[in-house]
Amino acid sequence: MIDIGLSKMALIGAVALIVIGPEKLPRVARTVGTLLGKAQRYVADVKAEVNRSMELDELKKMKDTVESAAREVHDSIQTSASAFEKDWAEAIDSAAPLPGSTATVPAPEYKHPGKRWRLKRSALPQWYKARSGVRSKALSGAARVARYRPGKSR
């Protein structure tokens, strides 16, 4: 901030000792130190704010360039899509129907395959379910402990 050498600091200290006196000098030095600290923090805050505003300006410029590029891409896609639609309409209009195909064939109807997955799943043999670990009933932890506790007669 301010460039003061060691000799200048000693001269300022000697003048302050003579003018203020040895009793009040520590309190004045603390006050001056506090004020200098506040001034340095204020300058740092101002610098940070200026940097932030400069970055915002740069980001706004970048945003504008990206938006203009996106607008150009959108316009080019729009023009090519309209040209394609125009060509497609011309191709459809110019395509003449064949002489023998005056009758239109209806599109085939969708027929559900009818696989019935759940029925097939339940139709598995019981021995296969037992070996592959398919559970038909779920047990809670407490019920499992009560059922499989060793050494207790029922």
Swiss-Prot record:
Example of a GO cellular component annotation carried by this entry: TAT protein transport complex
One Gene Ontology term of the molecular function aspect: protein transmembrane transporter activity
Coiled coil ranges: none
Domain of life per record: Bacteria
Keywords: Cell inner membrane, Cell membrane, Membrane, Protein transport, Translocation, Transmembrane, Transmembrane helix, Transport
Keyword Manganese in record: no
Main location: membrane
GO biological process: protein transport by the Tat complex
Matching Pfam families: TatA_B_E
Membrane topology: Single-pass membrane protein
Subcellular location: Cell inner membrane
Transmembrane regions: 1-21
Subunit note: The Tat system comprises two distinct complexes: a TatABC complex, containing multiple copies of TatA, TatB and TatC subunits, and a separate TatA complex, containing only TatA subunits. Substrates initially bind to the TatABC complex, which probably triggers association of the separate TatA complex to form the active translocon.
PANTHER family documented for this protein: SEC-INDEPENDENT PROTEIN TRANSLOCASE PROTEIN TATA, CHLOROPLASTIC (PTHR33162:SF1)
Function: Part of the twin-arginine translocation (Tat) system that transports large folded proteins containing a characteristic twin-arginine motif in their signal peptide across membranes. Together with TatC, TatB is part of a receptor directly interacting with Tat signal peptides. TatB may form an oligomeric binding site that transiently accommodates folded Tat precursor proteins before their translocation.
Family that this chain belongs to: Belongs to the TatB family.
UniProt-listed NCBIfam families: tatB
Protein name: Sec-independent protein translocase protein TatB
Annotated source species: Verminephrobacter eiseniae (strain EF01-2)
Gene name tied to this protein: tatB
